Amino acid sequence: MKLPMAALGFVLGSAFFFLAGSVYSQEPSSQSPIFPTPQRLRTLGQQPDDGPVIMLNLLKFKPDGGRAAYGRYGAIAIQQIRRRGGEILYGGEVAGLLGPGSEWEEVVIVKYPSRAAFLDMSQDPEYLQALPHRDEGLDATLLYAFRPAEGLTRLDDDGDVPTVDAAGADAYFNINLLRYKGEEGREAYERYTANTFPLIAELGGRPVLRLVGEQPLVGDEEWDELLFIMYPSREAFLGMLQDPDYREGTPDRTAGLDNTLFLPTRMTLGGAR
């Protein structure tokens, strides 16, 4: 059901009230680096390497050709990723709920079979030759390493993390980066999700990925988890925010989070598209 524009405006205001509260978003800065430092790459290589690593890329392009330049980099990077058994789990454009929103423009979620595979790619001569296109294209980026949340991440029949299904032309995929207020904050947020996930299911949505943060490779914020949720439409998500049952759980969300970054997106890569 489509909401009238006046109602959407009211809901949008409520969305910012319920989703913001005492939490803060990290917007891109052109002063930030766009390449991982050697120290951060070494730290990644020192982590246990007994499963896949999933990289979240948030992208802001330079004006006047930045997106095209990054596309030239991406064409080579995708070949390198696939050569090592990795894949693009999801690619999408950041979509404002009623108009311009975050200054981040695109999100790409990439799965590598191991940390060694990612580090090997970062030293490949062919990949290194593509990096000037990345530099030419990006004004800012966030690159963060995650691993599947044991017992919480939906796996395919092979026990692997699946690509994200397209889920319909109107689907919204909401990225939630979460940092908790310690263990008590995590418990409060779990109460919030226990209340909210059934409401999402009633709308025809679902949690798609739940990942545990390992370390930033580019960017300074520390994140505990990434929660990636599909809604069948923008209206479904905004309508849920007005549900009294949803509102009942929002104090636990505010109590649980020390920081968050919320990005609504529309799919451009992944699944059936």
Which residues are covered by each model-predicted region?
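Flexible, disordered linker segments and immediate boundary regions flanking tandem C2H2 zinc-finger modules
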Residues: 131-134, 250-251
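Bacterial N-terminal signal peptides that target proteins for export
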Residues: 1-10
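Short S/T/G/P-rich N-terminal loop/turn motif that feeds into the first structured element of a domain
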Residues: 16-107, 113-123, 127, 137-248, ...
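Hydrophobic membrane-insertion alpha-helices, especially the h-region
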Residues: 9-17
